[in-house]
Amino acid sequence: MPKMKTKSSAKKRFRVRPGGTVKRGQAFKRHILTKKTTKNKRHLRGTVAVHETNMGHIAQMLPFAGL
């Protein structure tokens, strides 16, 4: 059986919190920002938790995260 490996892209994009939830950065804040309102850009700051329906995919990509 081959080695289990962590997906490098997931390793860079997700962080596991002590409680077992996973945080991620928000999308739509990289470019084409002139047409977005200041309020919209402000709400895209920071991180949010990954939704429960996606946690199975995250657990497969991060096998050693203990999810």
Curated annotation (Swiss-Prot):
Parts forming coiled coils: none
Read off the lineage from the record. Bacteria, Pseudomonadati, Pseudomonadota, Betaproteobacteria, Burkholderiales
Into which family does the record put it? Belongs to the bacterial ribosomal protein bL35 family.
Look up the domain of life of the source: Bacteria
Q: Per its UniProt record, what SUPFAM superfamilies does this chain match?
A: L35p-like (SSF143034)
Full protein name: Large ribosomal subunit protein bL35
| Organism name | Leptothrix cholodnii (strain ATCC 51168 / LMG 8142 / SP-6) (Leptothrix discophora (strain SP-6))
Q: Which InterPro entries match?
A: Ribosomal_bL35 (IPR001706), Ribosomal_bL35-like (IPR021137), Ribosomal_bL35_CS (IPR018265), Ribosomal_bL35_sf (IPR037229)
Q: Which GO terms describe its molecular function?
A: structural constituent of ribosome
Q: Which UniProt keywords apply?
A: Ribonucleoprotein, Ribosomal protein
Q: Which cysteines are joined by disulfide bonds?
A: none
Q: Is Ribosomal protein one of the keywords UniProt gives this record?
A: yes
GO:BP terms for this protein? translation
NCBIfam families, alphabetized: rpmI_bact
Pfam families according to UniProt: Ribosomal_L35p (PF01632)
Q: Carries keyword Ribonucleoprotein? A: yes
- Cellular component, GO, one term: cytosolic large ribosomal subunit
